[in-house]
Amino acid sequence: MRRIARAFLRRCRVSEPVAGLVVLAVSELVTNAVVHGEGEVVLRITVGVDVVRVSVTDHNPAPAVLKEAGPDGESGRGIRLVDAISDAWDSSGEETWCEFQDARAAA
């Protein structure tokens, strides 16, 4: 999934620093959906003029939430990481999304 996302972002001329953050968010959100979600997982990456949006949907109606992971905890850091690296994020239950500002050079 990360390799496909990175190739797509490269084709869309997303700046490398932003692309790296987007790929990290893709990994965290898809993993979260696989581990905590239900049914099919769908990833959408939308590249606009100055923003990249990542959306992951599954069939779990419970929204993703920020959790405090203990120092020895093996989980609970994914959404906190997305919160730290993205410019905005939210979860409505079946969909969790995040956005990254990207001032790409004109083609």
Regions from the PLM with identified roles:
Residues R2-R3, D83:
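Generic alpha-helical structural signal
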Residues R3-S27:
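Conserved short strand/loop->alpha-helix "switch" segment adjacent to the catalytic nucleotide/phosphoryl-transfer site
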Residues V34-A107:
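Conserved beta-strand-loop-beta-strand hairpin that lines the nucleotide-binding pocket
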